[in-house]
């Protein structure tokens, strides 16, 4: 009875040791050896001067191959004063009649306009 328990415990310990060894070997193969070389990989053909071409030395600073996502990725540039406006500020919403006061109704290009100086018309509907 004790021999049977001893065999089960030994098989369990052997299984744990084999699984640890396999997982350790797997992670060591997948890990990058030197992180500095990963960040400074050079583009093809710019690895440095060759011993044959000593007279044609070109000083080119290599760029990193890796792309690092930063906080400014995809953001637009700041406001430019020369940019064209979608809605020109100089023209009023209700056309050229400046005696009207118009309010947006919630429907695209539909405004409710009222006269500013107390004229006889109560409400007019305008489409801009």
Curated annotation (Swiss-Prot):
Residues 26-29, 47-63, 77-128 form a propeptide. GO terms for cellular component: extracellular region. Its main location: secreted. Keywords: Amidation, Cleavage on pair of basic residues, Neuropeptide, Secreted, Signal. Residues 1-23 form the signal peptide. It comes from the Eukaryota. The keyword Ribonucleoprotein does not apply. The modification Tyrosine amide is found at residues 44, 73. GO terms for biological process: neuropeptide signaling pathway. It is found in: Secreted. Neuropeptides RYamide-1 and RYamide-2 are ligands for the G-protein coupled receptor RYa-R. RYamide-2 is the most potent activator of RYa-R. This is RYamide neuropeptides. It comes from Tribolium castaneum.
């Amino acid at each position: 009875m004790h021999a049977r328990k001893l065999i089960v415990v030994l098989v369990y310990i052997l299984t744990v040791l084999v699984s640890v060894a396999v997982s350790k070997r797997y992670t060591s193969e997948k890990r990058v050896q030197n992180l500095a070389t990963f960040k400074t990989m050079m583009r093809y053909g710019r690895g440095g001067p060759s011993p044959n071409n000593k007279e044609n030395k070109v000083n080119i600073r290599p760029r990193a191959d890796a792309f690092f996502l930063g906080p400014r990725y995809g953001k637009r540039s700041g406001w430019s004063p020369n940019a064209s406006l979608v809605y020109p500020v100089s023209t009023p919403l209700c056309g050229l009649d400046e005696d009207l006061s118009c309010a947006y109704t919630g429907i695209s290009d539909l405004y409710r306009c009222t006269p500013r100086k107390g004229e006889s018309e109560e409400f007019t509907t305008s489409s801009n």
